[in-house]
Amino acid sequence: MALSASLHLRQSQSLVMTPQLMQSIQLLQMTHLELGQFIAQEVEKNPLLEFQSADEAGFGSDRPERDETGLTAEAGGAEESVDHGDLYDSATTSPGERLSTELDADFANVFQDDTAPQRADAPELLGQWKSMPGAGGSNDGEGYDLDDFVAGRKTLRETLIEQVAFAFAAPADRLIAQHLIDQLDEAGYLHAEIAETAARLGASAADVTRVLLVLQQFDPPGVFARTLSECLAIQLRLRNRLDPAMEALVANLELLARRDFASLKKICGVDEEDLIEMLAEIRKLDPKPGTSFETSVTEAIIPDVVVRSAPDGGWLVELNPDALPRVLVNHDYFAEISRHSQKNSAEQAFLSECMQNANWLTRSLDQRARTILKVASEIVRQQDAFLVHGVDHLRPLNLRIVADAIKMHESTVSRVTSNKYILTPRGLFELKYFFTVSIGSAENGDAHSAESVRHRIRTMISQESADAVLSDDDIVDILKRAGVDIARRTVAKYREAMNIPSSVQRRREKRALAKAAGF
Protein backbone atom coordinates (compact mmCIF):
# COMPACT_ATOMS: atom_id res chain seq x y z
CA MET A 1 0.00 0.00 0.00
CA ALA A 2 1.48 3.33 -1.06
CA LEU A 3 1.99 6.10 1.46
CA SER A 4 0.68 9.55 0.63
CA ALA A 5 0.45 12.91 2.37
CA SER A 6 -2.84 14.76 2.66
CA LEU A 7 -4.22 17.84 4.42
CA HIS A 8 -7.32 17.61 6.64
CA LEU A 9 -9.21 20.26 8.63
CA ARG A 10 -10.59 19.32 12.03
CA GLN A 11 -12.27 21.30 14.81
CA SER A 12 -11.49 20.37 18.40
CA GLN A 13 -11.53 21.88 21.86
CA SER A 14 -8.61 21.68 24.27
CA LEU A 15 -7.56 23.33 27.48
CA VAL A 16 -4.62 25.69 26.99
CA MET A 17 -2.72 27.12 29.95
CA THR A 18 -2.07 30.67 28.83
CA PRO A 19 0.53 32.85 30.59
CA GLN A 20 -2.27 35.04 31.94
CA LEU A 21 -4.08 32.05 33.42
CA MET A 22 -0.87 30.79 35.00
CA GLN A 23 -0.35 34.25 36.50
CA SER A 24 -3.86 34.22 38.00
CA ILE A 25 -3.24 30.82 39.58
CA GLN A 26 0.07 31.99 41.01
CA LEU A 27 -1.50 35.14 42.44
CA LEU A 28 -4.20 33.08 44.13
CA GLN A 29 -1.79 31.03 46.21
CA MET A 30 0.60 33.87 47.09
CA THR A 31 0.72 35.30 50.59
CA HIS A 32 0.21 39.04 50.93
CA LEU A 33 3.99 39.48 51.34
CA GLU A 34 4.75 37.51 48.18
CA LEU A 35 1.99 39.38 46.38
CA GLY A 36 3.44 42.72 47.43
CA GLN A 37 6.86 41.72 46.09
CA PHE A 38 5.35 40.51 42.82
CA ILE A 39 3.39 43.74 42.31
CA ALA A 40 6.48 45.80 43.12
CA GLN A 41 8.29 44.01 40.29
CA GLU A 42 5.36 44.62 37.94
CA VAL A 43 5.24 48.31 38.84
CA GLU A 44 8.95 48.57 38.13
CA LYS A 45 8.55 46.96 34.71
CA ASN A 46 5.26 48.59 33.69
CA PRO A 47 5.30 52.42 33.45
CA LEU A 48 1.49 52.53 33.51
CA LEU A 49 1.20 50.88 36.95
CA GLU A 50 1.49 52.83 40.17
CA PHE A 51 1.11 52.04 43.85
CA GLN A 52 -1.84 53.64 45.58
CA SER A 53 -1.35 54.67 49.18
CA ALA A 54 -3.99 54.24 51.85
CA ASP A 55 -4.59 58.00 51.93
CA GLU A 56 -5.16 58.12 48.17
CA ALA A 57 -7.48 55.15 48.38
CA GLY A 58 -9.61 56.87 51.01
CA PHE A 59 -8.76 54.44 53.79
CA GLY A 60 -9.16 56.97 56.54
CA SER A 61 -10.22 55.58 59.88
CA ASP A 62 -12.60 58.46 60.50
CA ARG A 63 -15.10 57.53 57.80
CA PRO A 64 -18.51 57.28 59.47
CA GLU A 65 -20.25 55.18 56.83
CA ARG A 66 -19.53 51.80 55.26
CA ASP A 67 -18.78 52.10 51.58
CA GLU A 68 -20.84 49.91 49.31
CA THR A 69 -17.94 49.13 46.99
CA GLY A 70 -15.99 47.30 49.70
CA LEU A 71 -15.85 43.54 49.59
CA THR A 72 -17.97 42.29 52.47
CA ALA A 73 -19.87 39.07 52.93
CA GLU A 74 -22.41 38.18 55.56
CA ALA A 75 -22.07 34.60 56.74
CA GLY A 76 -24.57 33.84 59.43
CA GLY A 77 -27.37 32.18 57.61
CA ALA A 78 -28.29 31.01 54.17
CA GLU A 79 -28.16 34.49 52.71
CA GLU A 80 -24.82 35.82 51.60
CA SER A 81 -24.46 39.38 50.44
CA VAL A 82 -21.41 40.38 48.43
CA ASP A 83 -21.18 43.59 46.43
CA HIS A 84 -19.91 42.73 42.98
CA GLY A 85 -18.54 46.16 42.15
CA ASP A 86 -15.01 45.84 40.88
CA LEU A 87 -12.54 46.20 43.73
CA TYR A 88 -10.00 47.69 41.34
CA ASP A 89 -12.41 50.07 39.60
CA SER A 90 -13.75 53.53 40.31
CA ALA A 91 -17.41 54.42 40.68
CA THR A 92 -17.17 58.04 39.54
CA THR A 93 -16.42 59.79 36.29
CA SER A 94 -12.87 60.95 35.65
CA PRO A 95 -10.97 62.61 32.80
CA GLY A 96 -9.55 59.20 31.93
CA GLU A 97 -13.01 57.95 30.99
CA ARG A 98 -13.47 60.82 28.57
CA LEU A 99 -10.16 59.96 26.97
CA SER A 100 -11.18 56.36 26.36
CA THR A 101 -13.37 57.38 23.44
CA GLU A 102 -10.62 59.43 21.84
CA LEU A 103 -8.00 56.70 22.11
CA ASP A 104 -10.28 53.73 21.43
CA ALA A 105 -9.05 52.09 24.65
CA ASP A 106 -10.95 50.21 27.32
CA PHE A 107 -10.24 51.61 30.78
CA ALA A 108 -12.55 49.26 32.67
CA ASN A 109 -11.26 47.31 35.63
CA VAL A 110 -8.52 49.83 36.40
CA PHE A 111 -8.09 52.50 39.04
CA GLN A 112 -8.68 56.09 38.17
CA ASP A 113 -5.85 58.25 39.37
CA ASP A 114 -8.12 61.07 40.54
CA THR A 115 -10.75 59.07 42.36
CA ALA A 116 -10.54 57.25 45.63
CA PRO A 117 -12.20 53.86 46.10
CA GLN A 118 -13.72 53.67 49.50
CA ARG A 119 -13.50 50.88 52.04
CA ALA A 120 -15.59 49.68 54.87
CA ASP A 121 -14.87 50.90 58.33
CA ALA A 122 -12.22 48.77 59.95
CA PRO A 123 -13.92 46.30 62.30
CA GLU A 124 -13.24 46.32 66.00
CA LEU A 125 -11.14 43.18 65.79
CA LEU A 126 -8.90 44.74 63.17
CA GLY A 127 -8.46 47.79 65.35
CA GLN A 128 -7.53 45.59 68.28
CA TRP A 129 -5.02 43.74 66.11
CA LYS A 130 -3.44 47.00 64.97
CA SER A 131 -3.05 48.11 68.59
CA MET A 132 -1.00 45.03 69.49
CA PRO A 133 2.73 45.57 69.98
CA GLY A 134 4.62 44.86 66.79
CA ALA A 135 1.51 44.74 64.62
CA GLY A 136 2.10 45.86 61.08
CA GLY A 137 0.01 47.76 58.64
CA SER A 138 0.60 51.33 59.79
CA ASN A 139 2.97 53.66 58.03
CA ASP A 140 2.07 56.93 59.69
CA GLY A 141 4.67 56.59 62.47
CA GLU A 142 2.16 57.03 65.28
CA GLY A 143 3.09 55.16 68.43
CA TYR A 144 6.71 54.88 67.35
CA ASP A 145 9.11 55.68 70.18
CA LEU A 146 12.67 56.39 69.03
CA ASP A 147 14.02 56.08 72.58
CA ASP A 148 12.53 52.60 72.91
CA PHE A 149 14.10 51.63 69.61
CA VAL A 150 17.54 52.96 70.52
CA ALA A 151 17.39 51.35 73.95
CA GLY A 152 16.40 48.00 72.49
CA ARG A 153 17.60 44.79 74.04
CA LYS A 154 21.08 43.60 73.11
CA THR A 155 21.71 40.44 71.23
CA LEU A 156 23.52 37.47 72.74
CA ARG A 157 26.60 38.20 70.65
CA GLU A 158 26.76 41.84 71.78
CA THR A 159 26.46 40.81 75.43
CA LEU A 160 29.28 38.29 75.13
CA ILE A 161 31.57 40.64 73.19
CA GLU A 162 31.31 43.20 75.99
CA GLN A 163 32.41 40.58 78.54
CA VAL A 164 35.34 39.49 76.38
CA ALA A 165 36.92 42.93 76.73
CA PHE A 166 37.09 42.51 80.52
CA ALA A 167 37.95 38.81 80.69
CA PHE A 168 40.91 38.62 78.28
CA ALA A 169 43.92 40.90 78.00
CA ALA A 170 45.93 39.04 75.35
CA PRO A 171 44.91 39.78 71.73
CA ALA A 172 45.30 36.09 70.84
CA ASP A 173 42.82 35.08 73.54
CA ARG A 174 40.35 37.71 72.36
CA LEU A 175 40.64 36.40 68.81
CA ILE A 176 39.87 32.86 69.98
CA ALA A 177 36.96 34.10 72.10
CA GLN A 178 35.42 36.07 69.25
CA HIS A 179 35.74 33.07 66.93
CA LEU A 180 33.97 30.83 69.47
CA ILE A 181 31.22 33.42 69.90
CA ASP A 182 30.61 33.30 66.16
CA GLN A 183 30.08 29.54 66.42
CA LEU A 184 27.15 29.84 68.87
CA ASP A 185 23.60 29.09 67.82
CA GLU A 186 20.54 31.02 68.96
CA ALA A 187 20.19 28.86 72.09
CA GLY A 188 23.78 29.63 73.18
CA TYR A 189 25.27 26.22 72.34
CA LEU A 190 28.72 25.88 70.79
CA HIS A 191 28.97 23.97 67.53
CA ALA A 192 32.72 23.77 67.02
CA GLU A 193 35.37 21.19 67.78
CA ILE A 194 38.40 22.22 69.84
CA ALA A 195 40.90 20.66 67.43
CA GLU A 196 39.24 22.18 64.36
CA THR A 197 39.13 25.64 65.94
CA ALA A 198 42.78 25.40 66.99
CA ALA A 199 43.87 24.37 63.49
CA ARG A 200 41.86 27.15 61.86
CA LEU A 201 43.27 29.86 64.13
CA GLY A 202 46.80 28.49 64.31
CA ALA A 203 46.57 28.12 68.10
CA SER A 204 47.09 25.16 70.37
CA ALA A 205 44.20 23.03 71.58
CA ALA A 206 45.21 23.84 75.16
CA ASP A 207 44.80 27.58 74.52
CA VAL A 208 41.36 27.09 72.94
CA THR A 209 40.26 24.91 75.86
CA ARG A 210 41.51 27.47 78.37
CA VAL A 211 39.60 30.29 76.65
CA LEU A 212 36.48 28.13 76.41
CA LEU A 213 36.52 27.42 80.16
CA VAL A 214 36.58 31.15 80.81
CA LEU A 215 33.78 31.78 78.33
CA GLN A 216 31.63 29.18 80.07
CA GLN A 217 31.60 31.44 83.12
CA PHE A 218 30.01 34.31 81.16
CA ASP A 219 26.44 35.49 81.48
CA PRO A 220 23.98 34.05 80.76
CA PRO A 221 24.88 30.94 82.80
CA GLY A 222 25.12 27.82 80.66
CA VAL A 223 26.31 29.50 77.50
CA PHE A 224 29.08 27.87 75.39
CA ALA A 225 27.93 24.38 76.34
CA ARG A 226 28.16 21.69 73.70
CA THR A 227 25.46 19.39 75.06
CA LEU A 228 22.42 19.74 77.29
CA SER A 229 24.20 17.85 80.07
CA GLU A 230 27.14 20.24 79.91
CA CYS A 231 24.78 23.24 79.89
CA LEU A 232 23.07 22.10 83.08
CA ALA A 233 26.41 21.18 84.67
CA ILE A 234 27.81 24.67 83.99
CA GLN A 235 24.82 26.31 85.65
CA LEU A 236 25.04 23.98 88.65
CA ARG A 237 28.78 24.60 88.94
CA LEU A 238 28.23 28.36 89.01
CA ARG A 239 25.68 27.80 91.79
CA ASN A 240 28.15 25.58 93.65
CA ARG A 241 25.70 22.66 93.46
CA LEU A 242 27.55 20.26 91.17
CA ASP A 243 28.20 17.48 93.67
CA PRO A 244 28.84 13.87 92.54
CA ALA A 245 25.16 12.92 92.82
CA MET A 246 24.02 15.88 90.73
CA GLU A 247 26.81 15.25 88.22
CA ALA A 248 25.58 11.67 87.80
CA LEU A 249 22.03 12.94 87.31
CA VAL A 250 22.88 15.39 84.50
CA ALA A 251 25.04 12.72 82.86
CA ASN A 252 22.01 10.40 82.59
CA LEU A 253 19.30 12.68 81.27
CA GLU A 254 18.01 9.94 78.99
CA LEU A 255 16.82 8.06 82.10
CA LEU A 256 15.10 11.21 83.30
CA ALA A 257 13.36 11.55 79.94
CA ARG A 258 12.03 8.01 80.34
CA ARG A 259 10.95 8.75 83.95
CA ASP A 260 13.10 5.84 85.11
CA PHE A 261 13.47 7.16 88.66
CA ALA A 262 14.47 3.78 90.08
CA SER A 263 17.59 3.63 87.91
CA LEU A 264 18.41 7.27 88.68
CA LYS A 265 18.29 6.63 92.43
CA LYS A 266 20.66 3.71 92.00
CA ILE A 267 23.13 5.60 89.77
CA CYS A 268 23.11 8.76 91.89
CA GLY A 269 23.24 6.86 95.17
CA VAL A 270 20.40 8.84 96.76
CA ASP A 271 17.03 8.03 98.23
CA GLU A 272 13.68 9.14 96.85
CA GLU A 273 13.50 12.37 98.84
CA ASP A 274 16.96 13.50 97.72
CA LEU A 275 16.14 12.64 94.10
CA ILE A 276 12.98 14.74 94.27
CA GLU A 277 14.98 17.71 95.57
CA MET A 278 17.54 17.26 92.81
CA LEU A 279 14.83 17.15 90.16
CA ALA A 280 13.25 20.30 91.55
CA GLU A 281 16.60 22.06 91.26
CA ILE A 282 17.12 20.82 87.71
CA ARG A 283 13.75 22.30 86.75
CA LYS A 284 14.96 25.76 87.79
CA LEU A 285 17.78 25.70 85.22
CA ASP A 286 17.58 27.13 81.71
CA PRO A 287 18.22 24.52 79.00
CA LYS A 288 18.49 27.24 76.31
CA PRO A 289 20.23 30.24 77.89
CA GLY A 290 20.61 32.15 74.64
CA THR A 291 16.93 32.33 73.72
CA SER A 292 16.23 35.14 76.19
CA PHE A 293 18.12 37.57 73.95
CA GLU A 294 16.90 39.37 70.87
CA THR A 295 17.96 37.52 67.74
CA SER A 296 15.82 39.00 64.99
CA VAL A 297 12.77 41.14 64.48
CA THR A 298 9.58 39.12 64.85
CA GLU A 299 7.06 39.99 62.17
CA ALA A 300 3.43 40.07 63.18
CA ILE A 301 1.06 37.93 61.14
CA ILE A 302 -1.29 40.13 59.15
CA PRO A 303 -4.71 38.49 58.71
CA ASP A 304 -6.07 38.29 55.19
CA VAL A 305 -9.69 38.09 56.37
CA VAL A 306 -11.43 39.58 59.39
CA VAL A 307 -14.60 38.18 60.98
CA ARG A 308 -16.78 40.10 63.40
CA SER A 309 -20.26 39.80 64.82
CA ALA A 310 -23.14 41.17 62.77
CA PRO A 311 -26.03 43.08 64.35
CA ASP A 312 -28.47 40.33 63.34
CA GLY A 313 -26.48 37.66 65.19
CA GLY A 314 -24.57 36.37 62.17
CA TRP A 315 -21.02 37.06 61.07
CA LEU A 316 -19.55 39.73 58.84
CA VAL A 317 -16.58 38.52 56.80
CA GLU A 318 -14.35 41.24 55.36
CA LEU A 319 -11.04 41.37 53.55
CA ASN A 320 -8.30 43.10 55.48
CA PRO A 321 -7.31 46.16 53.42
CA ASP A 322 -3.82 46.07 54.94
CA ALA A 323 -3.27 42.73 53.19
CA LEU A 324 -4.58 43.98 49.83
CA PRO A 325 -2.02 45.69 47.59
CA ARG A 326 -3.53 48.75 45.97
CA VAL A 327 -2.45 49.51 42.41
CA LEU A 328 -3.81 51.82 39.76
CA VAL A 329 -3.30 52.31 36.05
CA ASN A 330 -2.15 55.77 35.05
CA HIS A 331 -4.26 56.04 31.90
CA ASP A 332 -3.77 59.81 31.70
CA TYR A 333 -0.07 59.16 31.22
CA PHE A 334 -0.96 56.50 28.66
CA ALA A 335 -3.13 58.98 26.76
CA GLU A 336 -0.47 61.68 26.84
CA ILE A 337 2.26 59.37 25.52
CA SER A 338 -0.06 57.91 22.89
CA ARG A 339 -0.72 61.37 21.46
CA HIS A 340 2.96 61.93 20.82
CA SER A 341 3.77 58.47 19.47
CA GLN A 342 3.28 57.37 15.91
CA LYS A 343 0.71 54.75 15.07
CA ASN A 344 2.07 51.26 14.44
CA SER A 345 5.36 52.30 16.01
CA ALA A 346 7.38 50.29 18.52
CA GLU A 347 6.48 52.77 21.26
CA GLN A 348 2.76 52.38 20.60
CA ALA A 349 3.05 48.59 20.60
CA PHE A 350 4.94 48.69 23.89
CA LEU A 351 2.33 50.96 25.49
CA SER A 352 -0.52 48.78 24.27
CA GLU A 353 1.15 45.71 25.73
CA CYS A 354 1.70 47.51 29.05
CA MET A 355 -1.96 48.55 29.15
CA GLN A 356 -3.09 45.01 28.40
CA ASN A 357 -0.86 43.58 31.13
CA ALA A 358 -2.03 46.22 33.60
CA ASN A 359 -5.69 45.47 32.89
CA TRP A 360 -5.10 41.76 33.30
CA LEU A 361 -3.24 42.27 36.57
CA THR A 362 -6.01 44.39 38.07
CA ARG A 363 -8.64 41.86 37.01
CA SER A 364 -6.58 39.03 38.49
CA LEU A 365 -6.17 40.90 41.77
CA ASP A 366 -9.89 41.58 41.88
CA GLN A 367 -10.69 37.92 41.21
CA ARG A 368 -8.20 36.83 43.86
CA ALA A 369 -9.80 39.08 46.46
CA ARG A 370 -13.31 37.83 45.66
CA THR A 371 -12.26 34.19 45.70
CA ILE A 372 -10.59 34.56 49.10
CA LEU A 373 -13.70 36.26 50.46
CA LYS A 374 -16.02 33.61 49.04
CA VAL A 375 -13.99 30.72 50.49
CA ALA A 376 -13.60 32.42 53.88
CA SER A 377 -17.33 33.18 54.03
CA GLU A 378 -18.20 29.54 53.42
CA ILE A 379 -15.73 28.38 56.07
CA VAL A 380 -17.27 30.79 58.57
CA ARG A 381 -20.74 29.54 57.67
CA GLN A 382 -19.66 25.93 58.15
CA GLN A 383 -17.84 26.62 61.44
CA ASP A 384 -20.46 28.86 63.05
CA ALA A 385 -20.60 26.64 66.17
CA PHE A 386 -16.85 26.95 66.64
CA LEU A 387 -17.01 30.74 66.59
CA VAL A 388 -19.85 30.73 69.13
CA HIS A 389 -18.87 27.92 71.50
CA GLY A 390 -15.19 27.11 70.93
CA VAL A 391 -12.98 24.32 69.65
CA ASP A 392 -15.15 21.55 71.13
CA HIS A 393 -17.72 22.39 68.45
CA LEU A 394 -15.33 22.43 65.49
CA ARG A 395 -17.02 20.53 62.67
CA PRO A 396 -15.22 18.07 60.40
CA LEU A 397 -14.60 19.80 57.09
CA ASN A 398 -12.74 19.05 53.89
CA LEU A 399 -11.94 20.87 50.68
CA ARG A 400 -14.67 19.17 48.68
CA ILE A 401 -17.46 20.39 50.98
CA VAL A 402 -16.35 24.00 50.57
CA ALA A 403 -15.67 23.60 46.85
CA ASP A 404 -19.13 22.14 46.17
CA ALA A 405 -20.82 24.86 48.20
CA ILE A 406 -19.19 27.73 46.29
CA LYS A 407 -19.10 25.96 42.89
CA MET A 408 -15.32 25.92 42.60
CA HIS A 409 -12.67 23.25 42.17
CA GLU A 410 -10.93 21.72 45.18
CA SER A 411 -7.54 22.86 43.91
CA THR A 412 -8.77 26.46 43.93
CA VAL A 413 -9.92 26.16 47.53
CA SER A 414 -6.59 24.57 48.45
CA ARG A 415 -4.65 27.45 46.91
CA VAL A 416 -6.83 30.04 48.63
CA THR A 417 -6.43 28.50 52.08
CA SER A 418 -2.67 28.02 51.80
CA ASN A 419 -0.78 30.43 54.09
CA LYS A 420 -3.84 32.68 54.51
CA TYR A 421 -4.96 33.79 57.97
CA ILE A 422 -8.32 34.81 59.38
CA LEU A 423 -8.89 36.96 62.46
CA THR A 424 -11.93 35.82 64.46
CA PRO A 425 -13.34 36.54 67.91
CA ARG A 426 -11.68 33.23 68.90
CA GLY A 427 -8.25 34.37 67.76
CA LEU A 428 -6.04 34.29 64.69
CA PHE A 429 -6.09 31.05 62.69
CA GLU A 430 -4.75 29.77 59.42
CA LEU A 431 -7.58 28.88 57.06
CA LYS A 432 -6.20 25.33 56.87
CA TYR A 433 -6.92 24.97 60.60
CA PHE A 434 -10.63 24.56 59.93
CA PHE A 435 -10.13 21.50 57.72
CA THR A 436 -9.99 18.38 59.90
CA VAL A 437 -10.79 14.73 59.37
CA SER A 438 -14.05 13.26 60.57
CA ILE A 439 -14.42 10.87 63.52
CA GLY A 440 -17.66 8.93 63.69
CA SER A 441 -20.28 9.17 66.39
CA ALA A 442 -20.94 6.30 68.78
CA GLU A 443 -24.70 6.86 68.59
CA ASN A 444 -25.13 7.54 64.84
CA GLY A 445 -25.16 11.27 65.52
CA ASP A 446 -23.13 14.06 64.00
CA ALA A 447 -19.49 13.30 63.32
CA HIS A 448 -16.73 14.95 65.33
CA SER A 449 -13.64 16.71 64.02
CA ALA A 450 -10.22 15.33 64.88
CA GLU A 451 -9.11 18.70 66.24
CA SER A 452 -11.99 18.86 68.72
CA VAL A 453 -11.25 15.29 69.86
CA ARG A 454 -7.58 16.15 70.36
CA HIS A 455 -8.65 19.17 72.40
CA ARG A 456 -10.82 16.95 74.61
CA ILE A 457 -7.96 14.51 75.15
CA ARG A 458 -5.58 17.34 76.04
CA THR A 459 -8.12 18.83 78.46
CA MET A 460 -8.80 15.52 80.21
CA ILE A 461 -5.10 14.79 80.69
CA SER A 462 -4.35 18.30 81.96
CA GLN A 463 -7.05 17.95 84.63
CA GLU A 464 -6.02 14.52 85.94
CA SER A 465 -4.42 14.09 89.36
CA ALA A 466 -1.55 11.87 90.49
CA ASP A 467 -3.99 9.37 92.00
CA ALA A 468 -6.29 9.25 88.98
CA VAL A 469 -4.15 9.17 85.85
CA LEU A 470 -6.16 8.19 82.78
CA SER A 471 -4.94 5.38 80.56
CA ASP A 472 -5.69 5.32 76.85
CA ASP A 473 -8.50 2.83 77.49
CA ASP A 474 -10.00 5.15 80.11
CA ILE A 475 -9.93 8.02 77.63
CA VAL A 476 -11.63 5.84 75.01
CA ASP A 477 -14.41 4.96 77.47
CA ILE A 478 -14.96 8.61 78.41
CA LEU A 479 -15.09 9.69 74.77
CA LYS A 480 -17.50 6.90 73.85
CA ARG A 481 -19.82 7.96 76.66
CA ALA A 482 -19.64 11.45 75.14
CA GLY A 483 -20.67 10.05 71.75
CA VAL A 484 -17.25 9.78 70.07
CA ASP A 485 -16.51 6.45 68.39
CA ILE A 486 -12.72 6.20 68.57
CA ALA A 487 -10.20 3.38 68.86
CA ARG A 488 -7.50 3.13 71.51
CA ARG A 489 -4.71 3.25 68.92
CA THR A 490 -6.16 6.52 67.60
CA VAL A 491 -6.08 8.00 71.10
CA ALA A 492 -2.47 6.86 71.47
CA LYS A 493 -1.59 8.40 68.10
CA TYR A 494 -3.17 11.75 69.02
CA ARG A 495 -1.50 11.71 72.45
CA GLU A 496 1.94 11.05 70.98
CA ALA A 497 1.41 13.76 68.34
CA MET A 498 0.79 16.24 71.17
CA ASN A 499 4.00 15.06 72.95
CA ILE A 500 2.04 13.73 75.92
CA PRO A 501 3.75 10.76 77.65
CA SER A 502 2.02 7.51 78.54
CA SER A 503 -0.08 7.10 81.66
CA VAL A 504 2.76 5.24 83.43
CA GLN A 505 5.23 8.07 82.82
CA ARG A 506 2.65 10.71 83.74
CA ARG A 507 1.87 8.93 87.00
CA ARG A 508 5.55 8.81 87.96
CA GLU A 509 6.06 12.45 87.14
CA LYS A 510 2.92 13.67 88.92
CA ARG A 511 3.78 11.74 92.07
CA ALA A 512 7.32 13.10 92.03
CA LEU A 513 6.04 16.63 91.55
CA ALA A 514 3.49 16.18 94.31
CA LYS A 515 6.20 15.08 96.72
CA ALA A 516 8.48 17.89 95.61
CA ALA A 517 5.71 20.39 96.30
CA GLY A 518 5.57 19.18 99.89
CA PHE A 519 9.15 20.25 100.60
Curated annotation (Swiss-Prot):
GO BP terms, alphabetized: DNA-templated transcription initiation
Position of sequence motif RPON box: 487-495
Ranges for region Disordered: 74-96
Family membership: Belongs to the sigma-54 factor family.
KW Transcription regulation (keyword) present: yes
Pfam families in UniProt: Sigma54_AID, Sigma54_CBD, Sigma54_DBD
Originating organism: Sinorhizobium fredii (strain NBRC 101917 / NGR234)
Gene3D superfamilies: Homeodomain-like, RNA polymerase sigma-54 factor, core-binding domain
Keywords, sorted A to Z: DNA-binding, DNA-directed RNA polymerase, Nucleotidyltransferase, Sigma factor, Transcription, Transcription regulation, Transferase
GO cellular component, one term: DNA-directed RNA polymerase complex
Keyword Transport: no
Function: Sigma factors are initiation factors that promote the attachment of RNA polymerase to specific initiation sites and are then released. This sigma factor is responsible for the expression of the nitrogen fixation genes (nif operon), glnA and dctA for dicarboxylate transport. The open complex (sigma-54 and core RNA polymerase) serves as the receptor for receipt of the melting signal from the remotely bound activator proteins NifA, NtrC, or DctD for the expression of the regulated proteins.
Protein name, as recorded: RNA polymerase sigma-54 factor
Coiled coil: none
Top-level lineage group: Bacteria
One MF term in the entry's GO annotations: nucleotidyltransferase activity
DNA-binding region(s) from the entry: 396-415
Gene field: rpoN
PANTHER family: RNA POLYMERASE SIGMA-54 FACTOR
